[in-house]
């Protein structure tokens, strides 16, 4: 990403970045690269998203709640603003663990929604099934 300079911008960038910021890296280097932000900090994602997006482009990302809030605050410096925020709850009554965020250059108020993953152990919500059925075989 740091050395990627395409001739044109992108209308949509979708990212599932490394989550772990201040934790012990895994002994396996490949696993650490995928899970820890050491080589790709979230702030750098914003810099590159702003650079790579078209004027009406969307940057979509999933992060733990705390990191997502920090990313939103940092994104404002680069004139990227939350357009959609989905709070992902593990099950009913639990606080959200993740945020799905869509950032754009528009300064409109964000559309906020909630998504519950499981209604009970291994009993997934209809919304979650609809969202993941094309990716997870067990969701058919």
Labelled PLM ranges:
Residues 2, 89-92, 107:
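Residue-level detector of flexible, active-site-proximal loop/helix-junction positions
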Residues 3, 8-12, 17-44, 48:
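Mobile active-site "lid"/loop adjacent to the S-adenosyl-L-methionine
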Residues 11, 86, 118:
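Residues in well-ordered beta-strands of folded domains
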Residues 20, 78, 106:
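Phosphate/oxyanion-binding loops and surfaces in catalytic or ligand/nucleic-acid-binding neighborhoods
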Residues 34-38, 92, 121:
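Alpha-helix initiation/capping motif
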Residues 39-96, 101:
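Conserved Class I SAM-dependent methyltransferase catalytic core
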Residues 94-140:
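SAM/dcSAM-binding transferase cores
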């Amino acid at each position: 990403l740091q050395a990627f300079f395409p001739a044109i911008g992108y209308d949509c960038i979708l990212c599932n970045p490394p989550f772990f910021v201040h934790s012990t890296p895994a002994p396996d280097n490949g696993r650490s690269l995928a899970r820890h932000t050491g080589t790709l900090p979230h702030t750098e994602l914003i810099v590159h998203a702003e650079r790579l997006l078209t004027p009406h482009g969307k940057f979509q990302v999933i992060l733990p709640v705390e990191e997502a809030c920090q990313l939103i605050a940092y994104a404002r410096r680069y004139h990227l603003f939350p357009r959609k925020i989905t709070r992902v709850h593990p099950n009913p009554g639990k606080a959200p663990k993740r945020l799905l965020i869509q950032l754009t250059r528009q300064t409109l108020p964000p559309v906020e929604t909630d998504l519950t993953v499981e209604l009970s152990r291994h009993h997934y919500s209809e919304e979650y099934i609809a969202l993941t059925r094309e990716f997870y075989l067990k969701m058919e």
